[in-house]
A protein has these predicted regions:
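A domain-level signal for the mature, folded cores of soluble proteins
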Residues: 1-88, 98-203
């Protein structure tokens, strides 16, 4: 279920940009500013950082995220409709070295053109599933069985960093089950995932 940008459960927002790697097609100078991903979600098309094809951004949280009851963070994209969606994979880290990726699934079977649409019923665990103003929730508890958690390199009560990775859209990146992930491709100017904000629900 989507998290609205004014949801009372939101305890805070990303505080700093740890790293940014822009991919091809992020050509709008204003939307290359990573500071646009900090603070509260605006829910508008222009207050975002465009990652470009395959681009990544890593954000720091102060205080760190913690595993609470239900979703612990929400990622907001700037999609202008409920079906024209650009997707991202989400990873978390406690130390900035070991990043653990949330499971995701995409059941689309064919490439999507630059103005194509997606069926959200075929998507799970991918940021960008909802239109602007609504964030995709992620629950740290779903990572409890991961080896990185078991050996202590990822502390689910002290998650300092969240990374969003654009899926590129051409099927070259796969979901957790080996299925190709498709979203609108190719696109230009503001290609790839456009990050509005990341919210902390438990910290």
């Amino acid at each position: 279920t989507a998290i609205a940008r004014d949801d009372p459960r939101i305890a805070g927002w990303a505080a700093a940009v740890e790293a940014l790697e822009l991919g091809a097609g992020s050509d709008d100078p204003e939307l290359r500013d990573p500071a646009r991903a900090l603070g509260p979600a605006e829910g508008t098309a222009l207050d975002a950082v465009s990652l470009g094809e395959g681009g990544t951004i890593t954000l720091r949280f102060e205080p760190p995220l913690a595993d609470g009851d239900g979703p612990d963070l929400a990622v907001f994209e700037n999609g202008f409709s409920a079906s024209f969606l650009e997707l991202g994979i989400v990873e978390v880290s406690s130390d900035g070295v070991h990043f653990v990726r949330f499971d995701c699934a995409s059941l689309g079977t064919a490439p999507v053109g630059p103005f194509g649409t997606l069926d959200t019923a075929q998507l799970a665990g991918l940021a960008g599933k909802y239109e602007q103003g609504y964030g995709t929730p992620f629950d740290l508890a779903t990572l409890r069985a991961r080896p990185e958690v078991q050996v202590g390199v990822l502390d689910l009560d002290r998650v300092m960093l969240v990374r969003v990775v654009d899926v590129q859209g051409d099927g070259s990146i796969t979901d957790s089950f080996g299925h190709p992930i498709y979203d609108p491709h190719p696109t230009a100017q503001t290609a790839g995932f456009d990050l509005d904000a990341v919210a902390a629900l438990h910290a």
